[in-house]
Amino acid sequence: MTGDLNEFVAHFWPVRVVFGAGSTERIPAEVKRLGARRALVLCTPDQRDLAQRVLGDLGDLGAGFHDGAVMHVPEASVTRAAQAARDADADLLVAVGGGSTIGLAKALALHHGMRFVALPTTYAGSEMTPIWGLTADGAKRTGRDPRVLPSTVLYDPHHLTSLPPEVTGPSGMNAIAHAVESMYAPDRNPITMLLAEESIRAMAQGLPVAVDSPGDLDARTRTLYAAWLAGTVLGMVSMGLHHKLCHVLGGRFNLPHAPMHAVLLPHVAAFNEVAAPAELGRVAAALGAPGPGGAGAALHALLRFTCTERSLAAIGMPAQGIYDAAEHALADAYANPRQASREDIARLLRAAFTGEMPA
């Protein structure tokens, strides 16, 4: 599979998308359209104010809110949320937040058959994918199942204007990671590659502005559009070494999700450039840095401009965990254009640990 027009398979997921400033106001109408009686609003503790606003807008359709969403979706958090939904007699969820909250809604959809509406407040993109994740006993399991897709996604850039720079930068880099890995996925096709390039281009243009001027609505709209595209392609193709490493590090060391993606991405891109020069050349061009070997360096430059934490050490990775992580990364098969040994992965992680320029 080369990503050309000769032969490919494309699968598009049936998710309704409502995009634009002020789209939050349409949540009650979407809940009614789905025929729900009582909607429970999910969030993390720091999104409680927005969740309460959404609950107020729902009026008689609101069943309360549950603020127990946790990073990496621990099993215990799913059990608590399921009980909250039963206690509230809810037949629909409204997930307000980023990947943690949407991940919780996905787990409830998968294991308890609950439908949900998503209002993303970061660039994570999880809302557009059939990918779920669950953490138990220090390991994060992931899978794909169309049952975890939301019925409706509402993208409202107003909610990102309050996202601080230290969250905006890593979250945007996380979205770029989805698009970059889709460029060399074995099941890519011309449509996914076009969507990925447009996503990278839009995020690279808008993210520095959003970090520098968080209230710039045009920049927030552009970057949210980029995140939507990135999540869309993430849901259509398989991911490679980058996402595998993030699942391992997140599950074993509970590292913050978006900063982990941001730090690792330049190093994985540089590692893969020798095996996917054409695809990563297109990534470099979308980043505004055309030329051979440019993707890893351009991503590292964007990381340094938009993120304050630029190494695994800075986000809490223990140095002694490098070889353990490398070993676990080899435990399960994953698609990647370049085969990696344990020493290859350990070398990559050491460079990411110190934050040095990717080789």
Swiss-Prot record:
pH influence on activity: Optimum pH is 7.5.
Coiled-coil residue spans: none
Annotated signal sequence range: none
Substrates-to-products reaction catalysed: 3-oxoadipate + NAD(+) = maleylacetate + NADH + H(+); 3-oxoadipate + NADP(+) = maleylacetate + NADPH + H(+)
Top-level EC class as recorded in UniProt: oxidoreductase
PANTHER family linked: ALCOHOL DEHYDROGENASE, ALCOHOL DEHYDROGENASE 4
Record note on quaternary structure: Homodimer.
The protein, known as: Maleylacetate reductase 2
Organism of this sequence: Cupriavidus pinatubonensis (strain JMP 134 / LMG 1197)
Chain's gene name: tfdFII
